[in-house]
Amino acid sequence: MIIEISHFLSILATGLFFLVGYFSIFTPTSNSNYLSSLITRTYSQGFFFLFFSFLIYVWLAITDNFNVAYIANHSNTALPTFYKITSIWSAHEGSMFLWIVFLSLWGFIFNIRVNNNEILKPKSMGIISFILVGFLVFLLATSNPFVTILPIPPLNGADINPVLQDPALAIHPPTLYLGYVGFVIPFACAIAFLLHGDSEINWEALVKKWSVSAWVFLTIGITLGSWWAYYELGWGGYWFWDPVENVALMPWLAATAFIHSLGVSIKSSQLRIWTILLSILVFSLSLFGAFIVRSGIIDSVHSFANDPDRGLYLLGFIGLIVFTSVFLFVWRLSSIKSSSVIKKFSKQSFISINNILFGTLIFSVMLGVTYPLIYEFLFDQKISVGAPFYNAIFIPVVVLASIFLFFSVDSKWSRSINFEFFTAPIFLSAALSLALTFFVMQFFNTQSISILASIFAGSLIIFRYIYEIINFLFKKKYVNPFSVIAHMSLGLLLVSISFNSLLSTERALSIDINSMEEYKDLKIFFEDIGVENNSNYDSIQASFLVEDQNGRAFNLKPEKRRYFTRGQITTETAIHVTALRDIYITIGDQLDDGSWVVNVQINYLIRWIWFSALLMGFAGIILVFSKRVKA
């Protein structure tokens, strides 16, 4: 059968990647152009075998080949073709397959883009190849997507999880995976640098754009996941500190610190030790995320598997990677040449301080994720760590980091602050930020220190970079577009989150059909409720006519769906979007008196939160494709 061909190609790819790893690491490739060329060709062959194996798998899903157990368990003939494709990464085995294909893709692009004369390339390719072998063995031995149902396959499949039948799922997981595994490039180059032991090799310049590329994918992936959960799961917010959200946040925080540290290392040969350590940390946290999601040790809407064997394999494999990396780092530590003199209040000093603050955030998230697991293991009781814990740490640390970022704009490389540092941009930005903060405090009658501090810090960054843009427009002074857009996005993100927390409201209403309720400035009229029939589900759809204080009226139609195959019931939100707020309605159960529970949320500036995050990603794209822009 065709599935056997796909299976065989993946096994063949595993063998080729092993050969690349062995010859790259254990033979002197730097003295053999032929061997370097052979390694390049062999890796490419392994990638194409694996890629074609995946393409065959996609074709089998599209054509409803229920001989394949995974497809039978997660697809259905009634599914549109689009969802038959996305069903491949809707569960553990298929998503792991996609993860590995993307990992090999990063290696392939690095393989063909980097010249064979690059001294770090052979060993980097070897490290990537051995990591691929480890994950492929995990896939084939514990999570085999090629298992068949013999002798008689089912006539129809079990269907995909209804909450995953959404267009965003075509983009969110693949983008997130590309971000996770993309950090294999800086990790592999850092380890190759340690293996060579030559401190003069400029590995940082080699990995700069690769690192930013992975960071862009991770940023966009996290943002899309937040948006998807908002409208699909009925949570009505942008972030809920779910454990799997958190394990995506940790590598993003580490990667952000790594990219800044990388810029310092390239510019001044400082923080080189930090940079290597952060490259190891970023990839290790990406692997830790894979372990958390796929080991079954947590309950989450995002988790895939519940198999101790898989968890033990992943834990052992990740432990081997981390232990080997740290051992090499400690072994070569004394030979790494890095200028240790960082002048007070120089740009490097502010970046170093913020790296420490980012480390604090990473540690707090790691503690929040792992402490409940450890507690349950020791005492056989479940506990959870929620938003109050994270907010208590994140708000002051992020505000402090933003203030250091503000001062770093006017600081110089390798120079301490002098009197000229305290110039008009600093005083003007600070004055405008204080004025805005005072206005918010008075106009909205709030005494919340966390909200006011966040608005102050965010606006501080925005006003300072607006000054930079004005300088560019009228004085033609060069500005770094990556830095300006990325950091202004951070400021906008802080301000948007603050106003969202300050202004957003929620209320559960009990409404009869043909009756009206008022909430805030809204009049909500429950017009009707009806039944809709579709190819793979039917639904109860409510119709509401909503009118705001300006007389603008619009219809909202939330649903409760029942999917035929699984019999699962889901809630579909109805959202009216404006520039400043979302009107968000979900329908609950019918009460004994015939009325319906209707949950109404007014979410201010929530779209600006996602816009800010996507703008950060856009800034990264500018850096990746620009020849002039420097990190």
Give, region by region, the residue ranges found by the protein language model.
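Membrane-interfacial helix termini and the short, flexible loops that connect transmembrane helices
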Residues: 22-39, 69, 103-125, 191-207, ...
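Accessory, solvent-exposed terminal regions and/or long lumenal/extracellular loops of proteins
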Residues: 427, 491-630
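A conserved hydrophobic secondary-structure block that centers on an alpha-helix together
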Residues: 11-22, 95-150, 156-226
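Extended, hydrophobic alpha-helical segments in both membrane/secreted and soluble proteins
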Residues: 174, 181-191, 203-260, 274, ...
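Interfacial and helix-entry/exit segments of alpha-helical transmembrane bundles
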Residues: 42-48, 127-128, 202-224, 266-286, ...
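Transmembrane-helix bundle segments that line or gate the permeation/cavity pathway
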Residues: 50-72, 86-107, 138-147, 249, ...
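Contiguous transmembrane helix-bundle modules in multi-pass membrane proteins
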Residues: 1-33, 45, 50-52, 66, ...
